[in-house]
A protein has these predicted regions:
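Solvent-exposed loop/turn segments connecting transmembrane beta-strands
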Residues: 42-53, 87-89, 116-127, 156-164
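Short loop/turn motifs that connect adjacent beta-strands in outer-membrane beta-barrel proteins
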Residues: 29-37, 63-64, 102-113, 136-138
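Outer-membrane beta-barrel "beta-signal"
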Residues: 93-99, 162-175
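Flexible, solvent-exposed loop segments that connect beta-strands
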Residues: 31-40, 69-91, 111, 150-161
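Cleavable N-terminal export/targeting peptides
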Residues: 1-35, 175
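Transmembrane beta-strands of outer-membrane beta-barrel pores
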Residues: 42-48, 71-77, 99-103, 117-123, ...
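Membrane-embedded beta-strand positions of outer-membrane beta-barrel proteins
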Residues: 40-42, 69, 95-97, 113-117, ...
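Short glycine/proline- and aromatic-enriched beta-strand/turn motifs that initiate or cap beta-hairpins
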Residues: 25-71, 172-174
Length: 175
C-alpha cells in the first residue's frame, strides 16, 4: 500500500482537531444519556479490507435502547478503466437498534458498550462497539460488525459488503 505525505498530514490534522475539541470541553459527560441522547458520528471504516467513511445519527429511546441510521461508502479504485459510476456498489445505507450496557454493568458515565442488529440495503448485520465521551459534546467510538448475508443487493459488485467483517472508528458529537 502506497501512502503519501498528504495522507499523513491529513491524519495529523484530524488528530490535532480531535485533541483540541476534547481539551476545550468539560470533563463531565455521558456516553449514552437515554431518551435525551442524540448523536451524529463520523469515522473511518474498513469492510473486508476496503477503506471508506461512515456517517450516522443515533437517537435514544430509553436508558437501554437507541435507534439510528448510518451511511457507509467505500473507496473504489478503477483498475479496469471502466467509465461507469460504481458508487451504488460501494455504498450502503442502514438502520439499526442498539442495546446499551452502561446502566446494567454500572459503567462510568462517559463510557458505554452497545450491541445490536443492522438492516441495510446490502446486508443484515450484528454490531458491537464502545463509546467514550471527553465532554458534553465530543467523544470517540470504535465498532465492529459482521455482515451475515445480503438483503436487496443489486449491481455489478455483489460481494463488497455481504459476509465480511467491518471495523469503524471515529468521533461522536452530541446534539
Amino acid at each position: 500500500m502506497k501512502t503519501t505525505h498528504k495522507t499523513h498530514g491529513l491524519a495529523r490534522l484530524l488528530a490535532a482537531l480531535l485533541l483540541a475539541f476534547c481539551s476545550a470541553t468539560p470533563l463531565f459527560a455521558q456516553a449514552f444519556d437515554g431518551s435525551d441522547d442524540s448523536k451524529i458520528y463520523l469515522g473511518y471504516t474498513n469492510v473486508g479490507g476496503r477503506h471508506g467513511v461512515e456517517i450516522g445519527y443515533e437517537e435514544g429511546i430509553n436508558d437501554f435502547l437507541s435507534y439510528g441510521a448510518k451511511f457507509t461508502t467505500l473507496r473504489y479504485k478503477d483498475d479496469e478503466g471502466e467509465k461507469e459510476s460504481r458508487f451504488y456498489d460501494f455504498s450502503d445505507l442502514g438502520i439499526y437498534l442498539n442495546y446499551h450496557f452502561m446502566e446494567v454493568l454500572k459503567l462510568p458515565d462517559n463510557f458505554d458498550i452497545y450491541v445490536g442488529p443492522i438492516l441495510s440495503t446490502k446486508t443484515m448485520s450484528l454490531q458491537t462497539g464502545v463509546r467514550y465521551n471527553f465532554g458534553e459534546v465530543f467523544g470517540v467510538y470504535g465498532s465492529a460488525q459482521y455482515n451475515f448475508f445480503k438483503t436487496i443487493t443489486i449491481g455489478s459488485n455483489l460481494g463488497v459488503y455481504p459476509e465480511k467483517f467491518a471495523f469503524s472508528a471515529g468521533i461522536t458529537i452530541s446534539i
